[in-house]
């Protein structure tokens, strides 16, 4: 049987904390393999890693993942520490999906140049891996 995961789009104005917890519990109860959240800066969704921390506290088995985290907008050392902490509180159930974004509006919102985002993402992923292993 294939692994099935469900994504939580997390629109901030409509989301309540109990929605996140209930969604995570339902995913697990239905036998889903994973629960995923999205990341956007220039959109009204909630911060995905914090939502996954809530889901970690409400579940025991499902994997928790980002689909995808805009990993080159925040500082990579900060992302690495948050993901390591999430891995700790979830007993290693984290899958980190990182992208470099296709929407210039996310970059404009935080005043980071849109150009060269791919090469920046490669450098930042390397830094995070180093922080997790050294």
Question: What do the predicted segments below correspond to?
Answer:
Residues 2-15, 72-134:
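Flexible, glycine-rich active-site loops centered on histidine and acidic residues
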Residues 38, 67, 97-99:
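Structural motif
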């Amino acid at each position: 049987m294939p692994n099935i995961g469900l994504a939580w789009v997390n629109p901030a104005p409509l989301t309540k904390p109990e929605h996140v917890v209930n969604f995570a519990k339902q995913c697990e109860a239905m036998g889903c393999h994973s629960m995923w959240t999205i990341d956007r800066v220039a959109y009204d969704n909630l911060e995905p890693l914090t939502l996954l921390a809530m889901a970690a506290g409400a579940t025991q088995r499902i994997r928790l993942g980002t689909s995808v985290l805009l990993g080159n907008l925040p500082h990579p050392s900060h992302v690495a520490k948050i993901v390591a902490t999430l891995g700790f509180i979830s007993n290693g159930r984290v899958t980190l999906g990182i992208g470099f974004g296709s929407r210039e509006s996310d970059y404009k919102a935080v005043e980071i140049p849109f150009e060269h985002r791919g090469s920046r993402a490669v450098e930042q992923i390397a830094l995070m891996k180093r922080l997790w292993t050294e």
